[in-house]
């Protein structure tokens, strides 16, 4: 049996795995236990009452968190003409068509998000094997294929998170950094849960949001009591 590190022993002593914590208590606990030498992300896992084996019950989308994620995001946009100028004005680092595709084919991928206008998908389609495995392929379901590329760039820069359930029906994403004020982390979590509720498949039956847990990059998960969240989020 592997020996527990001092850090993990402390976490096990502090976190009751059988308890659901009030959101404020949960955030305070994460902050107390975040002893890594970098500013850890605060991540969330949401267990959904869906059958992930059925395509009509899968949940996928994007939402802009009110206080962002604390990450700086580099954006690449496939578009042309007036849209190209609008994308640059909105803050996109890379804008182009075939020239941008050629850069990517050479392995030059210094970006975190890819956005495309519909007319550019003929070019982006050639990059599916490169962008797809990295989760970067533009998709209208998450707002990254859109005629309004400038708005999409602004959303990405403002702290938009994309979400998609895994094979176990769990959503994993980030809601900020551990140095965020507790209120900001709480409001970001509530905004995410509101978005997930709006994305509930009509075929999903029973309890939809079954469990919510938050953790830091290097920490253990802390289960959150949804009763302590705003009415619209629980």
Swiss-Prot record:
It comes from the Bacteria. Gene3D superfamilies: 3.30.190.20, 3.40.50.790. One of its GO terms (molecular function) is rRNA binding. Keywords: Repressor, Ribonucleoprotein, Ribosomal protein, RNA-binding, rRNA-binding, Translation regulation, tRNA-binding. Signal peptide: none annotated. GO terms for biological process: regulation of translation; translation. SUPFAM superfamilies: Ribosomal protein L1. One of its GO terms (cellular component) is cytosolic large ribosomal subunit. InterPro entries: Ribosom_uL1_bac-type, Ribosomal_uL1, Ribosomal_uL1-like, Ribosomal_uL1/biogenesis, Ribosomal_uL1_3-a/b-sand, Ribosomal_uL1_CS. Part of the 50S ribosomal subunit. Binds directly to 23S rRNA. The L1 stalk is quite mobile in the ribosome, and is involved in E site tRNA release. Belongs to the universal ribosomal protein uL1 family. This is Large ribosomal subunit protein uL1. It comes from Salmonella typhimurium (strain LT2 / SGSC1412 / ATCC 700720). The gene is rplA.
